[in-house]
Amino acid sequence: MEFVKPVTQMVRYVPDRRFRMCAILCAAIAATASGARADWTHFRFDPAHRGVNPNETILSPANVANLTVKWRTNIGGGCFASASIFEGKLYTADTGSADGKLHALDIATGQELWTFPPDALRGDHAWTTPAVANGIVYFGVNRPIPVVYAVNAATGHEVWHHTGPIANIVSSPALIDGLLYVAFTDGSIRALDATNGQVIWNVTHVGGANSSPAVADGRLYIAMHNSGLLALDANTGSELWLAPMPGPQWSSPAVENGRVFVGSRDDHKVYAFDAVTGNTLWTATTSDWVQTSPAVSNGVVYIGNNSGNVYAYNAETGGLIWQSPVAPGFAFGSSPTLANGVLYIASAINASATEFDGKLYALDAATGQVLFSDFVSENDEGEARWVNASPTVDNGVVYIPNYGDGTVAAFGLNAPTPTPTPTATPTATPTATPTPTPSATPTATPTSTPRPRPTPKPGPTPRPRP
C-alpha cells in the first residue's frame, strides 16, 4: 500500500499556548500535592490508552471472586460508551435507543445527577466515552451532524460546542496539554483548544476513523479505517508516518515504552510498531477478528478477539504468554482492563447475532484463569444482554454500562461484617478483713511503774486479685 499524504491540512497556533499549558500543569501539581485520587478520565484510562489503572489497591486476585452488584441504574438508552470517573461522579453516554445524552451519576449510589443536552432528540447517537479534566466533560454526539461538547462536570451546563464535518463521530476524545483531539468517520482529525473549542489544527486523511486517537510523547496515533496506523505530530498535525494494515480497523492503539500496539480485524492479528519510526516490530496471529483495543502493562499486551478468547503476549517479542477461552463462541466488543493483577473484560454476542453472553469476567492477569463472572444485566426473561462497553475500575469498584437495556452496573465487595468486641466482666473487689484490736495487757504490782506497751497498728488492706 502506497504512502498516503493528508488531503488537506490547516494549522493554527494560539498565542497563549504556553500560558495555557503552564496553568494546566500547575493545577495538576496542586492536585497531586493535595492528595487527590487519580481518577479514570478517558477511554482506556488515559490519553495513551493503556487500559490500566495503576492506582487500584482494593480489588486483587485474592478477593475478586467476591464481587457483587452494588447498584444498577437504567439511563434509558443502550451504551457503547464506557464510563469515566471524576471526583465522585461517573460519566457515560447513551448510544441512541433513547436520545443520545451524556449522563452523570453518583458513583456511590448510582443516582442520576444530570443529563445533557436538554434539547436532545430521539435518534441522536452518542458513541464516545467522555474525557474529563479540570471540571469539564468532553464528548461527541451525532445530531445527526457530529457535535463535540464541553460540559461543566458539576452542573451539566454547556461550556462550548464545536460542530464537526458532515460525517459521524464514533471515536472517543483524547485530552492532554490543553488540547482536545477528536476524529470523524470522513477521515478528519482535529485538535481543539480545550478551554474554548477553537480549532488549533485540522487534517483530513483518506480511510476514515472509527478507532480513537491515542496521544503520548508529542505524537498522536490512530488506526485509520481502511489504510493503517497513522502517526501525527500532536502539536501541528503534520504526518509523521503511516504503517499499512489491512482494513477495516476498529481497534484503538495503546502506547507504552516506545511501542504502539493495535489489533487488526481482517487478518486476525495483533501488531506492535516502533512509536518513532512506524516500523513493524512483531505481529501475532489470533483465531478470529480483533476489534478490541489492547491493555498494556509491565511488558505484557492483553487483547480479546471475536471467538471469545483472551490473549497475553510479551510486549517486546510478541511471544504468547497465555491464551484463555473465556467465552467461546461470543465476540468481545469490550476491551480488556487491567488493575492490580486482575484483567476485566465483558462479552457480547455470538456470530449469528442470536445469543448474548452479557457477562463481566475477571481473570488472573498472570495465568488467564477466570476468577469471577456474572451478568452485567438481565431482561425480564432472565436472558443476558449485550455488553459492548469496556470495564472501568476505580477504588475497589468495577463500573460497566450495558448496551442491551441501558443500565449502568457497579460491582464491588461487600463491607466486612464488624466483629463484636466482647465487654470485659469486672472482677469483684474483695472486702478487707479488719485487724482486731488486741486486749489490754494486765499490769503486775511493780516496785516501779513500767512504760506502757504501744498499741499495734492495723494491718494493710489486701489488694484485690486481677
What are these regions (language model features)?
Residues 1-17:
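N-terminal secretory signal peptides that target proteins for export/translocation
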Residues 6, 22, 37, 156, ...:
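Intrinsically disordered, low-complexity serine/threonine-rich segments
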Residues 16-17, 30-38:
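Extreme N-terminus of proteins, especially the signal/transit-peptide cleavage junction
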Residues 22-32:
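Bacterial N-terminal signal peptides
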Residues 32, 407, 415-465:
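Ser/Thr-rich, Proline-interspersed low-complexity disordered segments
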Residues 36-61, 416-417:
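Sequence/structural signature of beta-propeller modules
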Residues 56-78, 84-126, 131-170, 174-422:
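Extracytoplasmic/lumenal domain signature
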